Each structure stands twice: as C-alpha cells, then as structure tokens.
C-alpha cells in the first residue's frame, strides 16, 4: 500500500491523461466573442447594512437565459478590488454573512447564482458540495458521456451539448458583466471557488487572461476527466470515435484551461476527496504556467471546508490586491 509521502511525490509530477485539443483556443475564443453581456437591472437587495452595500443584478447567458448575481461591497469607496465567488455543485449562492468576509478585507464580492440542476439529477447531486457524489458520476453527467459517441456530431458539437459547457459559459458571462460595474477596479479582479466553483474559477481565470489578477480554487472538479469515467468509455485504442470523445472532453477539462492561466494562483488539494480526485487537482496545478502559484495539500481532509486554507486565502488577497488594503 502506497504511503502518503510516496503518493504526494507522485502527484507533484502528474500531468493527467486528458490532453488539450488543438482547437481549444479557437473554440473558446468564439464562445467568448458571442458571450459579452453587461449587467442590467442593478437593484438594492432586501438586506440592510450601515457599512455595506447589498445589491443584485441580472445578465444574459449565451443561451438567452437571464441569470442573477449578488453584490456585497464596502460603502464610500469609488473603486474596489473584486472577487467573483463561484459556488459548488448542489449549493445555493452563499449567504450575505459569508460574503461579508471579503468586504471586511476591503473587497467587493460578486456571487453569481448557478443555474438549477434538472429535477432528474437534483436529488442525486444536491449534496455534491459535501463530497457525497463520486468524481465518476459527476463527470458522467456534466460531460454528457452517454451522448458523446454520436457518430454524426463533431468535437465542437459534442462539447457544446454537455451541461458543463453552459456552466463555463455562464461563469465567463458573469465575469464579463462584473468587469463593467462602476465600482470594480479592473486591474484587481480575482476568481474563487470550491469543487464545481473551483473549476469555474480556474476556467474563467484562463478565459480572462491578463484581465484576471488572481485565482483561488479548492478541490476543483473536472480536471483529468478521462481518468474519472468508467472503464471502457475511452479505450486505449486510438480510433476516430475515441479521439473525438477525448477531444470533446479536453475542450471542457479543467486541466486544459489550467494551461492558459498566467495570474497568481492559490489552490488546495484534499487527499481524501472522492468528488475531486487529487490526481485531477494536481494535474491542473502542474499544468499552470504562472510563475506565482502555490498548492496547499491536506492529507486528512476530504471535500470539506478547511480553516487553514481560508487563512491562506486572506494572505493571498492581501498580497495580490495591489496594496490597497
């Protein structure tokens, strides 16, 4: 049986099985070009606080659906460093009290609502944020693996049909809309999330490029996705069908996005997490080319809140906020 030390040594150099397809940059450039909403209907939320402004705004997703985001920011400051907080699978947008931890540091925080799961899978996935859904089951649904082998579909069509595609597109749309809010310091926009939110935070940081000042992700989903699916789905034999399936998954894989992240990065990996496998988290981290990056590894934690990592987040925010705090 492999010990923790040897396992960690293995993870330090693991880059994953899922490869980034050649059409990745072109595919996502097209998605971003057609997906540039502005915030609309900015209104006061039904919460009162003497020192903080609580607001909500809506924006249009690429499929025309109207989505909502929450805003919490300190009053009386013209421009603010801003964090976009993406929530985990099965979880509602975080409450105002949770968002206040960022405002207490002098940050504005924008928390987009994740669109609801279909009723058919809602019961199964509603506790995914607690680590009660396996990485294999999450991958099977969000990549729509049952339909990826349709012979008539191209790689791009396969990827666009997956539920994960729309969530990544939504996350970028929220970030684009956030950039044009009048209080946002465009030079200090960061992303953060856990699980599904961690994947969206990394993906969005990659798509924003130089417009993202930092990204924080704890146990992100959907990295090295090919290793998460059931045996036999992507066989070792290189047939046109298997290549197409692998490329479609690669277009949505968190590790593929990681290769495009150049901003300061802070990540956490829990070695007992079965929803976000440590191999995937480390594959994503090891592919990030950013010069300033750090991974915190927690051998005895699973898919759960980690107080130590929250302390690291505070230090990260203070370090990369441009000296405003």
Located regions from the model:
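Alpha/beta-hydrolase fold nucleophile elbow
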Residues: 182-195
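C-terminal catalytic histidine-bearing segment of alpha/beta-hydrolase fold enzymes
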Residues: 283-325
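Short beta-strand/loop motif that positions the catalytic acidic residue
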Residues: 261, 267-269, 273
């Amino acid at each position: 049986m492999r010990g923790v030390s040897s396992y960690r040594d293995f993870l330090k150099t693991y880059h994953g099985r899922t490869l980034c397809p050649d059409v990745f940059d072109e595919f996502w450039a097209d998605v971003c070009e057609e997906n540039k909403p502005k915030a609309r209907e900015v209104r006061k939320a039904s919460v009162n606080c003497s020192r903080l402004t609580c607001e909500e705004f809506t924006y249009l997703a690429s499929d025309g659906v109207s989505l909502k985001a929450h805003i919490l920011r300190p009053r009386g400051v013209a421009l603010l460093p801003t964090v976009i907080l993406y929530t985990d699978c099965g979880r509602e947008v975080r409450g105002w009290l949770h968002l206040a931890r960022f405002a207490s540091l002098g940050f504005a925080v924008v928390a987009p609502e994740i669109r609801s799961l279909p009723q058919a899978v809602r019961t199964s996935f509603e506790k995914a944020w607690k680590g009660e859904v396996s990485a294999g089951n999450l991958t099977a649904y969000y990549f729509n693996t049952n339909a990826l082998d349709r012979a008539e579909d191209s790689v791009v069509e396969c990827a666009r049909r997956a539920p994960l595609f729309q969530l990544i597109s939504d996350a970028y749309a929220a970030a684009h809309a956030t950039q044009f809010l009048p209080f946002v310091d465009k030079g200090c926009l960061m992303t953060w999330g856990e699980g599904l939110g961690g994947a969206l935070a990394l993906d969005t940081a990659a798509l924003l490029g130089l417009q993202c000042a930092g990204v924080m992700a704890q146990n992100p989903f959907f990295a090295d996705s090919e290793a998460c699916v059931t045996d036999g789905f992507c066989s070792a034999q290189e047939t046109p069908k298997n290549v197409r399936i692998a490329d479609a998954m690669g277009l949505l894989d968190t590790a593929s996005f990681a290769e495009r992240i150049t901003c300061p990065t802070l990540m956490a990996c829990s070695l007992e997490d079965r929803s976000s496998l440590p191999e995937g988290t480390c594959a994503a981290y090891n592919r990030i080319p950013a010069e300033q990056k750090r991974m915190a590894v927690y051998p005895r934690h699973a898919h759960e809140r980690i107080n130590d990592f929250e302390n690291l987040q505070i230090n990260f925010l203070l370090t990369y906020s441009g000296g405003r705090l």
